[in-house]
Amino acid sequence: MKIITLPDELNIESLQPIQIFDYCSTKEIAKQQIILNQNTFSFLIDGNKEVVFNNSTLSIDNSKFLIMKSGHCLMTEKLSVIRNYRSVLLFFSNETLLKFIRENELNRNKLSEFKSVYSFKYDEFIHRFVASLLDISKLSKSIQKRMLEVKFEEVILYLIEIYGTDFLFSLSEKSNALSQKFIQTVETNWMNKLTLKELAFLCNMSVSTFKREFEKNYAESPIKWFQNKRLEYAHHLLYKEQKSSSEIYFEVGYENLSSFIQAYKSKYGITPKQHHKD
């Protein structure tokens, strides 16, 4: 699968610190490897969107919009009932973000966690804001540049007023140290049914480097570790939540019931059904 770099590969004449792109598609994509070279608002209009980052995963319909940190992610786009996908994208550089924080003298809060993607619900203000972006996109490039600087400040100030500054400082946070980022990626995504290639992409590593780093941190192979984690979670669902094997096998990463039962018996010595009897 080809890696897509945004906004570089969009039909934009020249890259700017703040820029807009009205993205429309009639094709679905699943776990497309994306490199975001700028932070990005995705104002979803039609369809559904899911993004997976190293430290967070979000799915939205067109009642919400996303703001995403620059970096690596896996993106899924699903068409609406009218077989359409549309998202108004507003890109902005890290320099633009840091300049805004400095000029507005915002105080950095101590965050318990840093996330690479946030979702917010649409309201009347945001609906009007998106409509104004579409109007601006029809103007000359020189006017667009000046007006988008104002519009960027407008939407960030509004979101801070409603939601506080946590999202802003998460976006401005520098990347974690390599080992910390690696562990965070694994621990956040072990239930997301990602391939080793997809996990390695989120860590900006080759698959072979990912495997070496994994064994260094976890002292066993990725396949064995992920299988054990999922079986332990299955054990929790069977015991604590009293669910049946047929209800959970797909959720914990197995394509069919028989392979789940076989793996469970291999780990615990008895079948899930025998566990229920006990």
Regions found by a protein language model. Give the residues of each.
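Short, well-ordered alpha-helical segments
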Residues: 125-129
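A short, N-terminal "cap"/entry segment at the start of jelly-roll beta-barrel domains
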Residues: 1-16, 30, 139
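Terminal helix-turn-helix DNA-binding modules in bacterial transcription factors
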Residues: 184, 188, 193-198, 205, ...
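Short, Lys/Arg-enriched, Trp-marked, Pro/Gly-tolerant hinge/linker segments that flank
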Residues: 111-124, 137-192, 197-202, 216-224, ...
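Short hydrophobic/aromatic patch on the recognition helix
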Residues: 63, 210-214, 259-264
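N-terminal regulatory/effector-sensing and dimerization cores
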Residues: 14-110
